[in-house]
């Protein structure tokens, strides 16, 4: 009966992914340069069954496998953490642990590719939807997490579901994006702290160059021949900022809006 329930949850999750529109993550900085991460999780047509989870040190978990059985890698929380899970408590979408390491997953269709599941690596296999929980349970820094990733195999639980990519932030303020492309794990430093969805993260950084003309505030008066030109109103420096909901456009908006946010002290 349990196997049937798990397979049903995986099916519902894969169905929801086909309707997913948007995940947008930003990172604000305090005056002390401490990171404050935030994000959205938006779904097109289906209410999201989300839940708040509090996981103590010593909590035992085991990864699900593609057949729906919970017989993958076992792990015990070395650090307690809190987070937001979807569909069931093991599937943590975003969270932070007691030593300040934060992690979240973002929809990444068409561009990611995990290695196929191998029964011989069953005890090393962690499902993509449980990777955030595994990271938060085990690591205090990004470097520790990178080393740990060499010891596991990330797997998908359903071939119909999209791949995802991840944002990991440590207390020092360092942040990386992790993607699995052509079965290889790659890490990118994330100086902006922004993440959306497809295509790959480096493409989004390159695309920012298309908007090098944008700036906060208003453009200055300009004389063209005998004609005097003035902006119609405030905010003209952001004329041309894309307004649609595609991942590239959301990345651009998040990057520029974030850059104009005030820097505040912690309290």
Regions found by a protein language model. Name each.
Residues 21-36, 44-50, 157-162, 170-171, ...:
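C-terminus-biased signal that marks the final domain/tail of proteins
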Residues 94, 99-129, 142, 146-209:
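Acidic/His-rich structured neighborhood in mature extracellular/periplasmic domains
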Residues 22-120, 160:
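A contiguous strand-loop segment
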Residues 7, 68-81, 138-151:
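Short, basic/low-complexity N-terminal boundary segments at the transition from targeting/disordered tails
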Residues 1-4:
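Positively charged n-region of N-terminal signal peptides that target proteins for export
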Residues 121-153, 245-267:
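Alpha/propeptide regions of enzymes that mature by internal proteolysis
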Residues 7-15:
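Bacterial N-terminal signal peptides
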């Amino acid at each position: 009966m349990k196997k049937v329930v798990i397979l049903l949850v995986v099916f519902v999750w894969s169905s929801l992914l086909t309707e997913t529109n948007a995940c947008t993550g930003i990172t604000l900085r305090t005056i002390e340069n401490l990171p404050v991460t935030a994000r959205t999780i938006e779904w097109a047509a289906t209410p999201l069954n989300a839940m708040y989870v509090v996981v103590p040190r010593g909590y035992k978990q085991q990864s699900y496998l593609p057949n729906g059985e919970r017989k993958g890698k076992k792990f015990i929380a070395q650090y307690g953490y809190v987070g937001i899970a979807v569909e069931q408590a093991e599937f943590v979408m975003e969270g932070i642990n007691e030593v300040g390491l934060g992690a979240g997953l973002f929809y990444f269709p068409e561009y990611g590719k995990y290695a196929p599941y191998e029964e011989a690596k069953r005890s090393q296999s962690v499902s993509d939807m449980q990777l955030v929980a595994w990271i938060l349970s085990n690591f205090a820094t990004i470097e520790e997490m990178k080393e740990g990733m060499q010891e596991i195999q990330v797997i998908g639980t359903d071939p119909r579901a999209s791949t995802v990519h991840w944002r990991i932030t440590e207390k020092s303020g360092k942040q990386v994006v992790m993607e699995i492309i052509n079965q290889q794990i790659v890490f990118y430093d994330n100086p902006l702290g922004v993440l959306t969805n497809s295509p790959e993260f480096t493409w989004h950084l390159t695309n920012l160059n298309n908007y090098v003309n944008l700036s906060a505030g208003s453009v200055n008066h300009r004389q063209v021949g005998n004609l005097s030109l003035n902006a119609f109103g405030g905010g003209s420096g952001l004329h041309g900022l894309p307004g649609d909901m595609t991942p590239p456009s959301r990345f651009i908006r998040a990057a520029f809006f974030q850059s104009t946010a005030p820097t505040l002290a912690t309290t």
